[in-house]
Curated annotation (Swiss-Prot):
InterPro entries: PurM-like_C_dom, PurM-like_C_sf, PurM-like_N, PurM-like_N_sf, ThiL-like. PANTHER family: THIAMINE-MONOPHOSPHATE KINASE. Mg(2+) 5 binds at D215. This is Thiamine-monophosphate kinase. Mg(2+) 2 binds at D47, D75. Mg(2+) 4 binds at D30, S45, D75. Belongs to the thiamine-monophosphate kinase family. Reaction mechanism of ThiL seems to utilize a direct, inline transfer of the gamma-phosphate of ATP to TMP rather than a phosphorylated enzyme intermediate. It catalyses: thiamine phosphate + ATP = thiamine diphosphate + ADP. Pathway: Cofactor biosynthesis; thiamine diphosphate biosynthesis; thiamine diphosphate from thiamine phosphate: step 1/1. Catalyzes the ATP-dependent phosphorylation of thiamine-monophosphate (TMP) to form thiamine-pyrophosphate (TPP), the active form of vitamin B1.
Length: 325
């Protein structure tokens, strides 16, 4: 049976399993009606994902739904926000009901995990793409931003950057990894990144600045440097790598992917000396490693990379959709 737009929405996307109290009216009308809790600031982010640009055209729909939501959740994590609502505008080349069922099941699994509600969106026909709008709350005056770093702050990253780029290389047959367990781990880091929501919430009163690593450490830390009007000195020997990555690529390739590979969706943040002890306590029990890789400074401009105590020049750049090849 043919599935039209409204029956498609009703069948696959209008299936609220638990309504949030702050949603007065969700899917099914011209607008959603929403209530912002008292003494909370609304945090909003929007991402567009296009087949062949942001994801491989043959990606499993369950992985696509997970990643599409996870990368938006990562934006909320970088602000220290609590997830709340999602809008989804989905463009499909045709109606494949098996594809839609897999996509929507995965999407709602992750929505329910974070106690979120899909509140609206749109569907249309065309090349596969989607735009997600995510909304969350952060207590007034406690949001993390890119512009708060100060000279003397210590620079940290969560997790092990570079894994996602390696996973993509495996999927594109640019990297051969014979160990199935390592290959699966690296591919999963690309297809199903872990938004660091709990870490972002814990950093609200500890970090001066934060950003999620979507385009690579060079690019994303560069945003903090620019917004905060100070420099950053990074010791390359301190960058953390996963065992799975280190076992299968030479150190220089691991370094390149960690700095410029992108799509890790870890957090990079800066913490004043006074808060380092509290940071160890706050993040230490969350099960995700976090590593100090350098320090913000007033005596240099931009990013300075150190190897064996000496400055080194790197010509790598983070991902840029409009960069000239």
């Amino acid at each position: 049976m043919a599935c039209g737009e409204f029956s498609l929405i009703a069948r696959y996307f209008d299936r609220v399993r638990s309504s949030r109290l702050d949603v007065e009216l969700g899917i099914g009308d011209d607008c959603a009606l929403l209530n912002i809790p008292e003494k909370q600031t609304l945090a909003i982010s929007t991402d567009t994902l296009v087949a062949g640009n942001h994801f491989l055209p043959d990606i499993d729909p369950a992985d696509l739904a997970y990643k599409a939501l996870a990368v938006n959740l990562s934006d909320l994590a970088a602000m220290g926000a609590d997830p709340a609502w999602l809008t989804l505008a989905l463009t499909l080349p045709d109606v494949d009901e098996a594809w839609l069922e897999s996509f929507s099941d995965s999407l709602f699994d992750l929505l329910n995990y974070y106690d979120m509600q899909l509140i609206g969106g749109d569907t249309t026909r065309g090349p596969l793409s989607m735009t997600l709008g995510i909304h969350g709350f952060v207590p007034m005056g406690r949001a993390l931003t890119r512009s708060g770093a100060k000279p003397g702050d210590w620079i940290y990253v969560t997790g092990t950057p570079g894994d996602s780029a390696a996973g993509l290389a495996i999927l594109q047959n640019r990297l051969q990894v014979a160990d199935a367990k390592d290959a699966d781990y690296l591919i999963k880091r690309h297809l199903r990144p872990s938004p660091r929501i709990l870490q972002g919430q814990a950093l609200r009163d500890l970090a001066n600045s934060a950003i999620d690593l979507s385009d690579g450490l060079i690019s994303d830390l560069g945003h903090i440097v620019k917004a905060s009007d100070c420099g950053a000195r990074i010791d390359l020997a301190l960058l953390p790598f996963s065992d799975a990555l280190s076992r299968h690529v030479v150190p220089e390739q691991a370094l390149r992917w960690a700095l410029s590979g992108g799509e890790d969706y870890e957090l990079c943040f800066t913490v004043p000396e006074l808060n380092r002890g509290a940071l160890d306590v706050a993040l230490g029990h969350l099960g995700v490693p976090f590593t100090c890789i350098g320090q913000m400074t007033a005596d240099i401009e931009g990013l300075c990379f150190i190897r064996d105590g000496e400055p080194v020049t790197l010509d790598w750049k983070g991902y840029d959709h409009f960069a000239t090849p």
